[in-house]
Amino acid sequence: MHVSSLKVVLFGVCCLSLAACQTPAPVKNTASRSAASVPANEQISQLASLVAASKYLRVQCERSDLPDDGTILKTAVNVAVQKGWDTGRYQSLPQLSENLYQGLLKDGTPKATQCSSFNRTMTPFLDAMRTVR
């Protein structure tokens, strides 16, 4: 497996882990459990990955149905709030997501592979964006 392919797989796993967390659990107090189980730096990293992949889909994969960067960021913060995460530390989210996006542009993985992977793994987040608009 090429290093660039490994990056796409790891990025997809990160997206899937966050997407899986969007499904409500039948346990009371899920938000506080979720907030306690994911360190703040990991929260920001997961959200930045979602934002970067969404921007990649919109720009590189020509997904004109996806919103602008501001709406994507707003959706990411809304997801964090729904999870009970403390969004007060998210000032670095725009810059970190842009850094990840630039890294995706430099990645040697074929664009078609990245587009296909992101389209599959990002569905829950993309659906959440449609409600924010």
UniProtKB/Swiss-Prot annotation:
Keyword Secreted carried by entry: no
One GO biological process term: intracellular protein transport
Signal sequence segment: 1-20
Record-linked InterPro entries: Chap_lipoprot_PulS/OutS, Chap_lipoprot_PulS/OutS-like, PulS/OutS-like_sf
Residues covalently joined to lipid (S-diacylglycerol cysteine): C21
Topology of the protein relative to the lipid bilayer: Lipid-anchor
Pfam families: T2SS_PulS_OutS
Lipid-bearing positions (N-palmitoyl cysteine): C21
GO CC terms in record: cell outer membrane
Alphabetical UniProt keywords: Cell outer membrane, Disulfide bond, Lipoprotein, Membrane, Palmitate, Protein transport, Signal, Transport
Cell compartments where the protein resides: Cell outer membrane
Role description: Out proteins are required for the translocation of pectate lyases and cellulases across the outer membrane.
Assembly, per entry: Interacts with secretin OutD.
Identification of the protein by name: Pilotin OutS
Species this chain originates from: Dickeya dadantii (strain 3937) (Erwinia chrysanthemi (strain 3937))
Gene coding for it: outS
